[in-house]
Amino acid sequence: MATLRVHPEAQAKVDVFREDLCSKTENLLGSYFPKKISELDAFLKEPALNEANLSNLKAPLDIPVPDPVKEKEKEERKKQQEKEEKEEKKKGDEDDKGPPCGPVNCNEKIVVLLQRLKPEIKDVTEQLNLVTTWLQLQIPRIEDGNNFGVAVQEKVFELMTNLHTKLEGFHTQISKYFSERGDAVAKAAKQPHVGDYRQLVHELDEAEYQEIRLMVMEIRNAYAVLYDIILKNFEKLKKPRGETKGMIY
């Protein structure tokens, strides 16, 4: 039978790491998870996440609508100037030209909520990673028979994988919001007479507000579901075959 020789000192370090990680994880499950469930549930009940009238989220969009007469005169002068310039230089000027207004700020209400949400995403992702590692360290040596406990471990691990995938999407969603809002603001600045672009900015803010509430809810639910399923199956997860056997890793 092939065996892997491991120095006692190295094995001792691995054992210390394993014991420390298991202790941290069980402390998380016993006290930290219930605390986070309560905190996030309270966050969901705050007025900041329960705005009934979404029009109150509207942020100032300081993009003036130019006077049509002045714009027409300006356009005529521009056309005359373009005739006298080379095509490449004209294109360069167009690329370098800024919007016909000052800086347009982010929606402060949305930014404030995101500043509270992003640390929660980071936290739950790290805790989920820790619990996943703990579960993997409970997997026994692969053997025939008496694998019901191992099947329970696999089901819980599958749940954790799905939660991790969902949490990864939160960062993408936040970045996508700012990208799409920036594009909408740029279009509104470039074509200030088109009201649809202005309205698009407000629609994106309202949609992001609802997404933020859903993300907080999903994080709370992730803590609650993990806490519940691990608590109900703790014995099977900890000792899938009724006794502690060698780690698979």
UniProtKB/Swiss-Prot annotation:
Keywords: Proteasome. Residues 68-98 have a biased composition (Basic and acidic residues). One of its GO terms (cellular component) is proteasome activator complex. SUPFAM superfamilies: Proteasome activator (SSF47216). Induction: By interferon gamma. It comes from the Eukaryota. Residues 59-102 are annotated as: Disordered. GO terms for biological process: antigen processing and presentation of exogenous antigen. Pfam families: PA28_C, PA28_N. InterPro entries: PA28_C, PA28_C_sf, PA28_N_sf, Proteasome_activ_PA28, Proteasome_activ_PA28_N, Proteasome_activ_sf. Heterodimer of PSME1 and PSME2, which forms a hexameric ring. PSME1 can form homoheptamers. Belongs to the PA28 family. PANTHER family: PROTEASOME ACTIVATOR COMPLEX SUBUNIT 1 (PTHR10660:SF5), PROTEASOME REGULATOR PA28 (PTHR10660). Implicated in immunoproteasome assembly and required for efficient antigen processing. The PA28 activator complex enhances the generation of class I binding peptides by altering the cleavage pattern of the proteasome. This is Proteasome activator complex subunit 1. It comes from Mus musculus. The gene is Psme1.
